[in-house]
From Swiss-Prot:
Keyword set, alphabetical order: Amino-acid transport, Cell inner membrane, Cell membrane, Membrane, Transmembrane, Transmembrane helix, Transport
Impact upon substituting E226 to A/Q/K/R/W: Loss of activity
Function: Permease that is involved in the active transport across the cytoplasmic membrane of phenylalanine. Can also transport tyrosine, but not tryptophan.
Originating species: Escherichia coli (strain K12)
Protein name stated in the entry: Phenylalanine-specific permease
Consequence when changing W95L: 10% of wild-type phenylalanine transport activity
Chain's gene name: pheP
Amino acid sequence: MKNASTVSEDTASNQEPTLHRGLHNRHIQLIALGGAIGTGLFLGIGPAIQMAGPAVLLGYGVAGIIAFLIMRQLGEMVVEEPVSGSFAHFAYKYWGPFAGFLSGWNYWVMFVLVGMAELTAAGIYMQYWFPDVPTWIWAAAFFIIINAVNLVNVRLYGETEFWFALIKVLAIIGMIGFGLWLLFSGHGGEKASIDNLWRYGGFFATGWNGLILSLAVIMFSFGGLELIGITAAEARDPEKSIPKAVNQVVYRILLFYIGSLVVLLALYPWVEVKSNSSPFVMIFHNLDSNVVASALNFVILVASLSVYNSGVYSNSRMLFGLSVQGNAPKFLTRVSRRGVPINSLMLSGAITSLVVLINYLLPQKAFGLLMALVVATLLLNWIMICLAHLRFRAAMRRQGRETQFKALLYPFGNYLCIAFLGMILLLMCTMDDMRLSAILLPVWIVFLFMAFKTLRRK
């Protein structure tokens, strides 16, 4: 099997279609923001608040630090080798064929599940306006629209995601500003007060146990940041754009998440936040700001579609990279004249379309089930990034090479992140809603190992 960079060169020399470097720095930053700011913030935050109370703010801070360390590790590798397949390429090259096979297919499955979760959430948001229309109809409609956009070319995808993400970012800034105005102008109602952060049982209202358990749900909110690595093969000037994206994206995510949460928890008592709807829409609806609530619901809908849009992009590129490595069927390397990995895109879409059936059969449980499965696969992906980076740095040291964009706290940071992610996985085993996904993870790894061995024998 050839590595990704070698095959890319061979393909180019034969003048066959390859992935186009059509993404600028602004695209990359907002693609990563678009992949992370979505249902995890607007819908998934409800269960986290119920578990941790106001201390959920601390939970997001801790998870954000871990996410930043891992993204710096990924960023260091990507700047040195900006190839298709991202961390699956590095796992393959520096750990071995099975590590690349495991990383790539696990990431692909994760973003298929993310896509299903976001389409499910989009259907839930649409029920705010059309309560009688089932979620599966909306999931099917948005599935068709987003995949059609991605079939055109990477530049159109980048522009679409840029505007999707920009709408989200501006809306979050506006929501924080409007919330602060409501809070300090007296227009936020009788319940609005900064005292809400400690009035109902204190800041650690559910104790340290509640805070620690909430981390399993909080991790869902940070999934998608690794899209920075996926964009590398189509980034213009990756040596400059990737470091900027890595450094700025995590800061902005933390600002948006923690800023939004402070406003949310101050405007409304955390004990009244529900887990089955968007807390943000609920608060403005209860404040009789129906116009604002509808506008915010529209933004939240865009947020979900944005994350799914990012997932369609990343999944097709990951499959392309797997095929280049020899870890997926060769027909998936086919690239259209416009630079779109067409067969990879179509296969990913075909599997994601099962979300329509899931929402039809399990309309009330679909989102919770999908979120738990996403968290389990996300933990494995990030652990593989940390492990691949350890081998990458060892290889650089043997070659006497100095990297341009160094990860922080190496190697202690790698082991810290692995221990943290392992702790989250153990916590999931104690939670009724997440236990199944944690148990299925080792089964999934064994299945992939057997599939890998079978393919190698053939």
